[in-house]
Amino acid sequence: MTIKIGINGFGRIGRVLFRLAQLRSNIEILAINDLINVQYIAYMLKYDSIHGNFNGKIVIKNETLFVNGKKIRITNEKDPKNLMWGDLNIDVVIESTGIFLTTEDSYKHIQAGAKKVIITSPPKDNTPMFVRGVNFNEYVGQKIVSNASCTTNCLAPLAKVINDEFEIVEGLMTTVHATTATQKTVDGVSYKDWRGGRSALQNIIPSTTGAARAVGKVLPELNGKLTGIAFRIPTANVSVVDLTVRNKKIATYEDICQIIKYASNHDMKEVIGYTEDHVVSSDFNGNTLTSIFDAKAGLSLNNNFIKLVSWYDNECGYSSKVLDLSEFISTFS
């Protein structure tokens, strides 16, 4: 079964996801909608400062984009209702504009003929969120879903492994997060977040994150037990979660590492990674796992109170799981 996908919004996630989709024979991207023209879409797809040049053939003929010989329909519609996804029999629309963040707004894609929609951000309403390795089993055919955030995709699988085995009593999370497109290169106006308006090139910027609270939505047993903050740092890609928890069951740090290592080779094999190497952030650039546990970076105060460190490529890891979710929901009518 070939899954036919349309992308609405060709930003960082849209482009990285497009690249990763080329490696999956069961996924075909048939259309891209963005406000930029086909020439600029081709340029941004071909060249990437973080992930390098596109490994494939890109051709424009008569204002039409062809990638590796396959035609990609390019449109420039502001209103998703006008996208005519039905003409291409689109199975899943990847809603990656960062604008249509509710079921009501994203339903316009359904009205345009798409069968299902994945929002690539935490929703601003009660649209259900699904995280691979955590709650895919709760999907029952909803037409519009969210893949949560990149940080939630790192934190939730790790928290699930720990909670299932040791029962988390409470915890705090910090994500040290690479720069994203919403930040300013030099100091600028940011009424909603004054610190967020400061130069991303020169500062470590304290910020908020809903990732820890979102874990309580995909793992209800942890609802109200986790919260956290973020620091935006001047690196281009790859982020890291620092999770400090108090567990009910006693275990040494070494015991906990072994449980995570086991999960990385079994139930969480394509989600969680495990390393004992002396790694740094750039070592994970391009990694499609969403939570790579760093055994040498964590520690414990005692047998109930531990600090866990897990890396994630906030672009590739997340985008790969959007594709996984696309494959999964397409098996439901």
Curated annotation (Swiss-Prot):
PROSITE patterns for this protein: GAPDH
Residues holding NAD(+): R12, I13, D34, K78, T120, N314
Localization annotation: Cytoplasm
EC identifiers of the protein: 1.2.1.12
One GO CC annotation: cytoplasm
GO MF terms held by the record: glyceraldehyde-3-phosphate dehydrogenase (NAD+) (phosphorylating) activity; NAD binding; NADP binding
Active site: C150 (nucleophile)
Pfam families: Gp_dh_C, Gp_dh_N
Keywords tagged on the record: Cytoplasm, Glycolysis, NAD, Nucleotide-binding, Oxidoreductase
GO biological process: glucose metabolic process; glycolytic process
InterPro entries in UniProt: GlycerAld/Erythrose_P_DH, GlycerAld_3-P_DH_AS, GlycerAld_3-P_DH_cat, GlycerAld_3-P_DH_NAD(P)-bd, Glyceraldehyde-3-P_DH_1, NAD(P)-bd_dom_sf
Site (Activates thiol group during catalysis): H177
Positions that bind D-glyceraldehyde 3-phosphate: S149, C150, T151, T180, T209, G210, R232
Keyword Zinc-finger: no
Pathways per UniProt: Carbohydrate degradation; glycolysis; pyruvate from D-glyceraldehyde 3-phosphate: step 1/5
Superkingdom in the source lineage: Bacteria
Reaction equations catalysed: D-glyceraldehyde 3-phosphate + phosphate + NAD(+) = (2R)-3-phospho-glyceroyl phosphate + NADH + H(+)
Subunit structure, interactors included: Homotetramer.
Protein family according to the UniProt entry: Belongs to the glyceraldehyde-3-phosphate dehydrogenase family.
Cited function: Catalyzes the oxidative phosphorylation of glyceraldehyde 3-phosphate (G3P) to 1,3-bisphosphoglycerate (BPG) using the cofactor NAD. The first reaction step involves the formation of a hemiacetal intermediate between G3P and a cysteine residue, and this hemiacetal intermediate is then oxidized to a thioester, with concomitant reduction of NAD to NADH. The reduced NADH is then exchanged with the second NAD, and the thioester is attacked by a nucleophilic inorganic phosphate to produce BPG.
Protein name, per record: Glyceraldehyde-3-phosphate dehydrogenase
Gene: gapA
